Design a protein with these regions (language model features):
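A short SAM/SAH-binding and catalytic strip from SAM-dependent methyltransferases
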Residues: 130-138
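Conserved alpha-helix/loop element of class I SAM-dependent methyltransferases that forms part
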Residues: 41-59
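N-terminal, positively charged/glycine-rich alpha-helical extensions of SAM-dependent methyltransferases
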Residues: 1-32
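Class I SAM-dependent methyltransferase Rossmann-like catalytic core
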Residues: 32-41
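A short acidic, Gly/Pro-enriched loop at the edge of an enzyme's catalytic core
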Residues: 119-130
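Class I SAM-dependent methyltransferase SAM/SAH-binding core
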Residues: 62-120
Length: 138
């Protein structure tokens, strides 16, 4: 059962993730972040690359992206490092958009999406080799 703030977040962000990005926001994202993933967050490309190195992401490793929204930086990290990623968030719309992005990036076989709150993740201990939690409103 979702608590009130999770319901509010789901409603707010489902609407936001359902809107297509404008040309202006995509250009701004390319200039500021260095990538175009749908104006989803503020983690730069350089920061994402640093995370990949620090987490030692590579083929065969499993990454959990908590509060992934439209999939940035989790999908980027999976593509760049060849790891497997599980995206989690409360709003389904963001995860649907992320799954579409995974198809565009050619990584659907190494990515999945689960509607889940960070308060109650449905995974056992030691399921993942690394976890990222970026640009999440807590």
């Amino acid at each position: 059962m979702r608590i009130r703030d999770e319901q509010d977040a789901s409603a707010t962000f489902s609407e936001r993730y359902g809107r297509p990005g404008s040309d202006t926001t995509r250009e701004l994202e390319r200039l500021v972040i260095g990538a175009d993933f749908g104006a989803n967050g503020y983690t730069t490309l350089a920061q994402a690359d640093l995370m990949a190195r620090m987490l030692r992401l590579r083929k065969g490793r499993r990454l959990l992206d908590v509060g992934s929204g439209r999939g940035w930086p989790g999908l980027y990290l999976a593509k760049a490092s060849e790891c497997t990623v599980v995206l989690t968030d409360i709003p389904e719309q963001g995860l649907r958009t992320a799954q579409q992005r995974a198809a565009v990036e050619g990584i659907t076989e190494r990515s999945s999406a689960v509607v889940a709150s960070a308060r109650r993740l449905p995974f056992g201990a030691e399921t993942f080799d690394a976890i990222v939690h970026t640009d999440v409103l807590c």
